[in-house]
């Protein structure tokens, strides 16, 4: 009965070495006893007194059923290979009960199927129960993993949005720094020309005029550069003050166009300053050339007159000459 209720128990029972051979021997012993009673007292006496064969029909049917349940397990079929001839002899017996012979024939059928992948009904039911028990556990694990991954995905999305929102401001600042650097680089040539002009005009009489012109030009350049830088700084202050979250492609294009216009204005101012410095340098050079070609100075004239005049004779005393 235990073997019939559970396929695992059937496997355990079948692994006992004398189990199958003992059950087959029990049925064979009953069949031999029944054959002796039939030969001695006749078949009718055996039918009227089935207990005369040493056991009851119920016990024989129970033993045959146990063999059938053991044979249904795929792993036990190899254990019945040695008992096939004995089982076939019981099936072909004309004395044994027909129901017992039918059960044994089913045992032979299960053994003939071999050790294939086909499992018994009990084994399939056990597998279904195990799968049903594993499914809720796997569903709970998947739900827990999904619940744990959802906040991580939300945090990753928030960090991505914050990084994209914070990116436009550094671009504007770098553009402003580049523009300021370009303006400062454009303002360098006037200072260099000022140094050259001041060095060339140190030995001329027009040094004061040139220096005053250069100081005026330097003041004009500084005012232009300060105005350009102030306008640039105003633009850079107003541009980043806008909220980075609302910046769109149109606003970025407007900021870049304004920066280009400011850079163009600064370049024009620097070019005008360079032209004014060049004109001042040309005027200083012309004044120096005129001074070198013109008449000599008063100091040189007085020196020449002193050299040309001869030495005057010493004064004489009128009284002395008359006395002599």
Swiss-Prot record:
One of its GO terms (molecular function) is DNA binding. Residues 1-126 form the EHD domain. Its main location: nucleus. Residues 132-226, 287-324 are annotated as: Disordered. InterPro entries: BAF250/Osa, BAF250_C. Residues 154-175, 195-226, 287-310 have a biased composition (Low complexity). Keywords: Activator, Chromatin regulator, Developmental protein, DNA-binding, Nucleus, Repressor, Transcription, Transcription regulation. One of its GO terms (biological process) is imaginal disc-derived wing margin morphogenesis. Trithorax group (trxG) protein required for embryonic segmentation, development of the notum and wing margin, and photoreceptor differentiation. Required for the activation of genes such as Antp, Ubx and Eve. Binds to DNA without specific affinity, suggesting that it is recruited to promoters by promoter-specific proteins. Essential component of the Brahma complex, a multiprotein complex which is the equivalent of the yeast SWI/SNF complex and acts by remodeling the chromatin by catalyzing an ATP-dependent alteration in the structure of nucleosomal DNA. This is Trithorax group protein osa. It comes from Drosophila yakuba. The gene is osa.
């Amino acid at each position: 009965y235990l073997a019939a209720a559970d396929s695992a128990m059937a496997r355990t029972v079948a692994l006992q070495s004398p189990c199958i051979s003992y059950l087959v021997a029990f049925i064979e012993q009953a069949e031999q006893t029944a054959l002796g009673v039939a030969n001695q007292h006749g078949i009718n006496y055996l039918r009227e007194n089935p207990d005369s064969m040493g056991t009851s029909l119920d016990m024989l049917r129970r033993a045959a059923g146990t063999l059938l349940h053991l044979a249904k397990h795929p792993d036990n079929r190899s254990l019945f290979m040695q008992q096939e001839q004995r089982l076939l002899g019981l099936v072909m017996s004309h004395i044994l009960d027909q129901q017992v012979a039918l059960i044994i024939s089913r045992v032979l059928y299960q053994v003939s199927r071999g050790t294939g992948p086909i499992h018994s009904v009990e084994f399939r039911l056990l597998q279904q129960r195990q799968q049903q028990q594993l499914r809720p556990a796997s569903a709970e694990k998947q739900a827990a993993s999904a619940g744990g991954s959802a906040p991580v995905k939300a945090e990753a999305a928030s960090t991505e949005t914050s990084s994209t929102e914070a990116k436009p401001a550094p671009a504007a600042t770098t553009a402003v720094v580049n523009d300021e650097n370009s303006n400062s680089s454009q303002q360098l040539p006037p200072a260099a020309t000022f140094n050259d002009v001041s060095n060339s005009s140190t030995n001329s009489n027009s040094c004061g005029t040139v220096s005053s012109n250069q100081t005026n030009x330097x003041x004009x350049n500084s005012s232009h550069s300060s105005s350009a830088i102030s306008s640039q700084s105003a633009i850079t202050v107003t541009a980043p003050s806008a909220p980075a979250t609302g910046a769109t492609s149109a606003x970025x294009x407007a900021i870049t166009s304004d920066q280009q216009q400011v850079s163009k204005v600064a370049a024009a101012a620097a070019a005008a300053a360079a032209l004014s410095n060049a004109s001042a340098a040309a005027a200083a050079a012309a004044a120096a050339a005129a001074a070198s070609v013109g008449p000599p100075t008063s100091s040189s004239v007085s020196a020449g007159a002193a050299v040309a005049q001869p030495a005057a004779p010493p004064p004489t005393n009128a009284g002395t000459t008359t006395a002599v």
